[in-house]
Structure formats: C-alpha cells, structure tokens
C-alpha cells in the first residue's frame, strides 16, 4: 500500500507535531499506510510532552515529493507554511483550525476546519466518530497540543469544546491537566541555550496580508525581560531575515505566560502598521500588547485588517 505522509506546518509547535502523530495513528487504524513527519525542529515544550508520554518524535523532512505522491496536512493549509514542494504532491486531506488562505487543489478533498482552539480537539471528535480508542500515550500528546494552543485554557481562542476534550484526554492519559500543563508550559518557556536564530524561528509563520509579506514569530516566557535583554542581537538576526525573504514586516512576539500580556518587537518598512493596528507607539521598536496571547485570533486578523485599510 502506498505511503501517505502526515505533517503540520514549518517551525512546528506542539499541535503541529502531536496532531500529525495522532492523525497518522487514526489513519493507520482505518487501514491507511500513514506516517507522521515534521517540517522543522522540535521545540523544548513539544520534547517535554514526547518525553513525558514516551513517544518518539516524527522524522524530519524538507521535501515530500521525493517520497510520496499523496499527503495529509494538519494544523495548517497556507502554501508558504507547508512543505517546500507541496505543489508537486496531491493533498488528500486537511484537518485545521486556522483561516483558509493561499490554498487550492485540482481535485476535491476532505477538508475539515473548525473554529476551535486546537487541531487535536477536532481529532478527538474524529477518533470517536470512527469508533477508535485513543491510546494513553496519544491522548497525552493530544492533551499537550490543546494546553499549548490554549495557553492552559487562557487564550481567547480556547472554546468549551477544547476544555471538554482536554478533560477527556487527561483522564485517558492519567494526568492532572492543570498540573501537567503548567509543567509543560514552563518547559517551553525555558529559552536558555537557544541562539537568537533559534528564538526567532521556534514558532514562526509567514503570511500574505494584502500586498504585504509578513512573518510573525512567537515565544512564551516566564519573564519577557529574559528575552528582550538580547534585543540588539535579536534585531540584527531579524533584519537579516527581513532582507533575505523580502519581508515588509517581521513581528517577534514575546508572551508572558503568567500575566498573559505580550511585547512585540517590530522590524521592517511596515512596522508602523503595528502601531496603527493596536493603537500603540513603538519605542525602540517595541510595544506592550496588553492581553494579547493568540497569534491566530489577536494578531493575524488585526494586522491583516490594518494592512488592508
């Protein structure tokens, strides 16, 4: 049987990795030769979850057409966030919870996108719909994805469905969601030992906003100053990325997991759009974004609207 690769976006977060593992397992149970892979490095937060539940991480691939003809996307759909040669393969399915943009196919596909906080929440339903029992380890990874995407249920993207799914999965996994979740988030917020290049690419996504090319990277921290003390070095590597990719804006968002506020570092010719979007003034290229924790709900749509205004 021909193999199908299942993967999340570039610079994968916990949902991208864990949902690829969980959905590949469901597809295998349903008779497909599916393998989860990843398009980037595994973050400290994700590695904590993999280690905790004793699951091996997916292997890394840069291209997919050299291996398979068919793929399944989880936790993304936008072409620039996917495999470099995504146009050379057939996308069979998409399971996602983001906006739909820069995506089209030549054939009809199974496309499931729901306005929930995490892809794993959708997968929890799909396991039940197909009558497949979720293994303890996989339940733990799916729980980890929901905790990560919802910032332990504090993000405005978090829905009642996410909370209910997390409670169900925690029971299967045999953990206390709140206690385990805080441990996992703290592991993810430990940025010691990371280079500046790693910091700005840990969780970075590229977007087309009107005519503007924008990249938004986000890291969680227990104290934003632990990251911003390196601002001069950060600006240097961000400026290099802006030039290399021809970006109009690179927004580096440092989120405090204790206060649920963020600081944005904006570099590029369109940095003023951040001021316009949030009614703030950039001082030394930074501004505090009160109550902003979600790139999907509080940054991407707000900036997109500001660029198109």
Swiss-Prot record:
Q: What GO CC terms are in its UniProt record?
A: cytoplasm
Which top-level group of life is the source organism from? Answer: Bacteria
Q: Which organism is it from?
A: Bacillus cereus (strain ZK / E33L)
What SMART domains does its record include?
DHHA2
Q: Which SUPFAM superfamilies does the record associate with it? A: DHH phosphoesterases
A Pfam family in this protein? DHH
The positions annotated for binding Mn(2+) 2 are 15, 75, 97, 149
In which family does this protein belong, per the annotation? Belongs to the PPase class C family.
An annotated Gene Ontology molecular function:
manganese ion binding
Which controlled-vocabulary keywords does the entry list? Cytoplasm, Hydrolase, Manganese, Metal-binding
| Record's protein name | Probable manganese-dependent inorganic pyrophosphatase
What EC number(s) would the UniProt record show? 3.6.1.1
The residues forming a coiled coil are: none
Q: Which cysteines are joined by disulfide bonds?
A: none
């Amino acid at each position: 049987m021909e193999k199908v690769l299942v993967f999340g976006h570039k610079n994968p977060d916990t949902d991208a990795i864990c949902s690829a593992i969980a959905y590949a397992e469901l597809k295998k149970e349903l008779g497909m030769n599916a393998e989860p892979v990843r398009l980037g490095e595994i973050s400290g937060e994700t590695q904590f979850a993999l280690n905790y539940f004793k699951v091996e991480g997916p292997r890394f691939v840069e291209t997919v057409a050299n291996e398979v003809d068919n793929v399944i996307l989880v936790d993304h759909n936008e072409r620039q966030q996917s495999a470099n040669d995504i146009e050379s393969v057939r996308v069979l399915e998409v399971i996602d919870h983001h906006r739909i943009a820069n995506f089209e196919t030549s054939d009809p596909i199974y496309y499931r996108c729901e306005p929930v906080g995490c892809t794993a929440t959708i997968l929890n339903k799909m396991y039940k719909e197909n009558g497949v029992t979720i293994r303890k380890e996989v339940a733990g990874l799916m729980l980890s994805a929901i905790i990560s995407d919802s910032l332990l249920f504090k993000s405005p993207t978090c829905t009642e469905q996410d909370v209910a799914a997390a409670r169900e999965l925690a029971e299967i996994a045999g953990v206390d969601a709140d206690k385990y979740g805080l441990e996992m988030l703290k592991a993810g917020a430990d940025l010691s030992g990371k280079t500046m290049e790693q910091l700005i690419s840990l969780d970075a996504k590229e977007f087309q906003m009107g005519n503007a090319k924008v990249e938004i990277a986000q890291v969680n921290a227990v104290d934003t100053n632990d990251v911003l003390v390196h601002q001069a070095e950060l600006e240097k590597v961000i400026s290099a990325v802006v030039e290399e990719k021809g970006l109009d804006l690179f927004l580096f968002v440092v989120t405090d997991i204790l206060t649920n506020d963020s600081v944005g570092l904006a570099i590029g010719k369109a940095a003023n759009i951040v001021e316009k979007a949030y009614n703030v003034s950039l001082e030394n290229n930074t501004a505090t974004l009160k109550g902003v924790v979600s790139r999907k709900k509080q940054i991407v749509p707000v900036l997109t609207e500001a660029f198109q205004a």
